[in-house]
Amino acid sequence: MSKLTHVREDGSAHMVDVTGKNETSRTAVAEGFVKMRGDVVKQLFSAGLPKGDALPVARIAGIMGAKKTPDIIPLCHPLPLGKITVDFFELADGVRIEASVKTRGVTGVEMEALTAVSTAALTVYDMIKAVDKMAVIDGIRVLSKTGGKSGDWSVQ
């Protein structure tokens, strides 16, 4: 098993030293789902929810979440994010949220992509909970990443 890079010999946590790493172009794509009743899906995608048009709000929340990742996830490095996209795909039983993040830096952007998806999903949940109390956030994961010493990776 490989050693955790953010844990010192005595077991205490520290922020990994990335000052000696080369800058490379890095990307990450993550996804997540909000499951809900079919009638609520229709309201969500037609801007018909009591709280208003949820998808533009959730998109901005996801982008803001990615930018705030080092403020809410301990030990994450602040990164100059060059591009963040958050997209929504209608499903019969909910919405699939996909976030893509890009930077040129010394560490990856997987956490930023995951935070974008999570924040967007939480925002969708907040805006539908009045009409579907049984909604579920599920399946948040990294789909792919590029760049860095460990190279490219994808679930496919």
From Swiss-Prot:
* Active site (record annotation): 126
Q: Binding residues for substrate, per the UniProt record?
A: 75-77, 111-112
Tell me if Nucleotide-binding is a UniProt keyword of this record. Answer: no
Instruction: Give its E.C. classification number.
Output: 4.6.1.17
Which GO biological process entries does UniProt record here?
Answer: Mo-molybdopterin cofactor biosynthetic process
Q: Which Gene3D superfamilies does the record match to this protein? A: Molybdopterin cofactor biosynthesis C (MoaC) domain
Q: What class of enzyme is it?
A: lyase
Q: Which InterPro entries match?
A: MoaC, MoaC_bact/euk, MoaC_sf, MoCo_biosynth_MoaA/MoaC, Mopterin_CF_biosynth-C_dom
* GO function terms (MF aspect): cyclic pyranopterin monophosphate synthase activity
State the pathway, as annotated in the record.
Cofactor biosynthesis; molybdopterin biosynthesis
Q: Which domain of life is it from?
A: Bacteria
One Pfam short name: MoaC
- Keywords annotated in UniProt: Lyase, Molybdenum cofactor biosynthesis
Write down the chemical reaction(s) this protein catalyses.
Answer: (8S)-3',8-cyclo-7,8-dihydroguanosine 5'-triphosphate = cyclic pyranopterin phosphate + diphosphate
In terms of HAMAP family, this protein maps to: MoaC_B (MF_01224_B)
According to the record's subunit comment, the protein's assembly and interactions are: Homohexamer; trimer of dimers.
Q: Which family does the record claim for this protein?
A: Belongs to the MoaC family.
The function of this protein is: Catalyzes the conversion of (8S)-3',8-cyclo-7,8-dihydroguanosine 5'-triphosphate to cyclic pyranopterin monophosphate (cPMP).
What's the protein name?
A: Cyclic pyranopterin monophosphate synthase
Q: Recall the taxonomic lineage recorded for the source organism.
A: Bacteria, Bacillati, Actinomycetota, Actinomycetes, Mycobacteriales
